[in-house]
Amino acid sequence: MSNVTGAGGKWVDDVESLALYGYPECPYCRRVLNAIAVLEIDVPLRNTMIDSDHNAALLAATGRETVPVLRIEKQEGSIRWLPESLDIVRFLTDRFDRETKAMKQG
């Protein structure tokens, strides 16, 4: 079952699950975490500073340890790794912000 719901509990797009790789002390990660809180979505943090398995998964998938990176798993099973805090915030806002969606439709 999807862990990706927006405000009001509606399931979003074709995304099955999201996970943010980073750590709370990182200012760029903080930017993404703040957006997640404002959008009221459930995105687990995979703390790369305290869990070497998360850090290894990030390095294996992206070839780098730079954070934040959003792991996006689609329903059909494909996985995308999205780096850069502003790109992540834009991705999340485009999919989960009701006001942004209403402006695009109207």
Language-model-derived ranges and their functions:
Residues M1-E25, R30-G106:
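GST-like domain detector, emphasizing the conserved glutathione-binding G-site
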